[in-house]
Swiss-Prot record:
Protein name: Chalcone--flavanone isomerase 2-A
Pathway(s) it belongs to: Secondary metabolite biosynthesis; flavonoid biosynthesis
Similarity section: Belongs to the chalcone isomerase family.
Residues at the site labelled Important for catalytic activity: 107
One record GO biological process: flavonoid biosynthetic process
MF terms in GO: chalcone isomerase activity
Binding-site positions, substrate: 49, 114, 191
Additional free-text comment from the UniProt record: Part of the biosynthetic pathway for all classes of flavonoids, a large class of secondary plant metabolites, many of which are brightly colored.
Length: 226
């Protein structure tokens, strides 16, 4: 199922389709937003990855209750809006496609650093989260990601983080690892689109696309997604 306004998004020659079916999920998700992740190095903005976020259709009815009257600008500026996406009771799927080559260690250590920073700021960093971070780092330990390859995350409301890899932009049918830790599963997404998320462009895209979807007739009716 896809709505007319759910279109593909192209980020630096990487095209993310309107809908996908993640590995090991029976559900089809819609493309909620996408954008580049980069860093300002000296006087140049260096783009490292293209990030996209897909959501289960149930997300629309859940999020619209609080946010359907807000403008794109209001959503973009609201930390709570993105927090509701991160913690909402629906599945999420994220794809990170390389623009620049990265090693698994480079990628995973930066994500882990961001996750730990989030937990420490909230005072919720425990031994359980430290163990989950160790598992996360070990999944990426010996991997390399050339341009065009992808890392894929599926976040389940029950607290599992499923990790998959692809040599290109396609969605694999098999998974590489599953880590059972709710805080980690949410923190990986929060590190992308949360208060200090690494991709402001993806946040802007999410706010714009969801703002328009909320206003489409019937889109936020849970019965229309069955």
């Amino acid at each position: 199922m896809a709505f007319p306004s759910v279109t593909s998004v192209t980020v630096e020659n990487v095209t993310f389709p309107p809908t996908v079916k993640p590995p090991c999920s029976p559900n089809t998700f819609f493309l909620a937003g996408a954008g580049v992740r980069g860093l300002q190095i000296h006087h140049a903005f260096v783009k490292f990855t293209a990030i996209c976020i897909y959501l289960q259709y149930d997300a629309l009815s859940f999020l619209s209750v609080k946010w359907k009257t807000k403008s794109t600008h209001q959503l973009t500026e609201s930390d709570q809006f993105f927090s509701d996406i991160v913690t909402g009771p629906f599945e999420k799927f994220m794809q990170v496609t390389m623009i620049k080559p990265l090693t698994g260690q480079q990628y995973s250590e930066k994500v882990a650093e961001n996750c730990v920073a989030i937990w420490r700021s909230l005072g919720i960093y425990t031994d359980s989260e430290a163990e989950a971070i160790d598992k996360f780092l070990s999944v990426f330990k010996d991997l390399t990601f050339p341009p065009g390859s992808s890392i894929l995350f599926t976040v389940s409301p029950n607290g599992s983080l499923t990790i998959s890899f692809s040599g290109d932009e396609t969605i694999p049918e098999v998974t590489s690892a599953v880590i059972e830790n709710k805080l980690l599963s949410e923190a990986v997404l929060e590190s992308m689109i949360g208060k200090n998320g690494v991709s402001p462009a993806a946040k802007q895209s999410l706010a714009s696309r969801l703002s328009h979807l909320f206003k489409e007739p019937g889109v936020c009716d849970p019965q229309s997604h069955k």
